[in-house]
């Protein structure tokens, strides 16, 4: 590591999209938008781009489309960071639950907010009830932001569901798993899901059904996350550092040169 940047002190989060960077201070709701080339000179004492208030949430896809939910304003803001720092549009919303039970993402330019307290999903402001599909499952998580797609994936301890962005119809894709889920991922025409019991699911090219595999050497306490670089993705356990090649046969990566 040759350089470091002083980030805001209150729960900072950094989102990257091409040449644009969003620095979000979760504790205060302050959001800065900067060029990646200028990140080394970022000053957390400078005026923020947006002040979203406490308990706000942000999400940005790889094209730089950012959505931000401000509970204090009761609005979801859309910002096309690739072309402007200004708000493109806003939508009035009412979100149930608490800040700890809510999360935000986007698919194909549509924002979605999941509330795990009520097992409900807001899709562009329309509420979709997921309680029947999630049942007694726990730990529901929204998929990572995706530039493309016509439905959003929600993983939970018992499986995986998809919700149509157009109709709100809910379909169960996986129903027989267990463990803590990773945030599902849609990338380069494929959907991915994984759980800490070692089960991994992948579907590509619009196939009607996905393929399930068991990943070797998965710790039961794994904290899983799909990590991406362009069109490449791996599954990583943030606790142990173990990584699996989910775009191949799901093998544990112990030689990066061979990969």
Model-derived regions, located:
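Repeated scaffold domains used in trafficking and secretory/extracellular systems
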Residues: 3-20, 26, 45-65, 90-110, ...
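Surface-exposed loop/turn elements that mediate protein-protein interactions on large endomembrane-trafficking
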Residues: 1-10, 28-51, 72-97, 115-137, ...
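A generic structured-segment signal
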Residues: 232-233, 243
């Amino acid at each position: 590591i040759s350089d470091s940047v002083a980030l805001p002190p209150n729960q900072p989060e950094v989102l990257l999209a091409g040449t644009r960077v969003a620095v979000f201070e979760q504790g205060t709701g302050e959001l800065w938008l900067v060029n990646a080339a200028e990140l080394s000179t970022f000053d957390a004492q400078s005026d923020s781009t947006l002040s979203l208030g406490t308990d706000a949430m942000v999400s940005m896809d790889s094209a730089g489309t950012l959505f931000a939910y401000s509970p204090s304003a009761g609005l979801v803001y859309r910002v096309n960071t690739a072309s402007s720092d200004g708000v493109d549009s806003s939508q009035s919303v009412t979100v149930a639950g608490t800040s700890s039970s809510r999360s935000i993402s986007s698919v194909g330019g549509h924002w979605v907010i999941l509330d795990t307290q009520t097992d409900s999903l807001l899709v562009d402001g329309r509420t979709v009830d997921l309680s029947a599909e999630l049942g007694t499952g726990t730990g529901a998580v929204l998929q990572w932001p995706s530039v493309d797609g016509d439905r959003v994936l929600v993983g939970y301890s018992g499986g995986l569901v998809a919700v149509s962005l157009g109709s709100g119809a809910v379909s169960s894709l996986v129903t027989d798993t267990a463990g803590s889920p990773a945030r599902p991922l849609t990338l380069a025409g494929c959907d991915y899901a994984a759980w800490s019991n070692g089960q991994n699911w992948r579907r590509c090219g619009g196939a009607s059904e996905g393929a399930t595999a068991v990943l070797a050497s998965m710790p039961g306490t794994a904290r899983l996350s799909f990590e991406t670089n362009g069109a490449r993705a791996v599954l990583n356990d943030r606790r142990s550092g173990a990584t699996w090649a989910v775009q191949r046969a799901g093998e544990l990566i112990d030689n990066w040169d061979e990969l």
